[in-house]
Amino acid sequence: MLEVKNLKFGYSAMMPVLNDISFQAGNQEIVAILGSNGAGKTTTLKTVSGLLKPWEGTITYNGEDITGMPAYGVLKKGISLVPEGRMLFGKLTVYENLSMGAYTRKNQDEIKKTLDMVYELFP
């Protein structure tokens, strides 16, 4: 389970972006983060995936505190961020782009099984 509690982050003291964000996502659960442009959706995901360090709050994954853990350590736990738009690999298929984060710890059968489940839910 991924649990985010009281997450706060900003790009400067004058520009807070995340103010007391909290949510849970169970294993195998698909969760959507919704909001308008500039609301902090991508910042939240970058913070959870270790690309940004929160000012305050905690992030736990399966009971382990991963708050402030470097992105590579978070990736080894199985959490990764699929980049948006121009950050995708244009020569790769959707399947290949989505499975990039899994290559560090899962075998090809596990990757295929997981992505097949996503394809069924979102054809």
Where are each of the predicted segments found?
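The feature captures the beta-strand-to-loop junction immediately N-terminal to the Walker
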Residues: 34-36
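Conserved structural motif at the start of ABC-family nucleotide-binding domains
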Residues: 2-4, 17-18
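Helix-to-loop junction immediately C-terminal to a conserved catalytic motif
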Residues: 49
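ABC-type ATPase nucleotide-binding domains, specifically the catalytic core motifs of the NBD
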Residues: 12-13, 31, 69, 94-113, ...
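ABC nucleotide-binding domain signature
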Residues: 32, 75-86, 116-118
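Short coil-to-beta microelement around the adenine-binding A-loop and adjacent beta1/P-loop entry
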Residues: 14-16, 72-73
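Conserved ABC transporter NBD signature motif
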Residues: 57-64, 77, 110-115
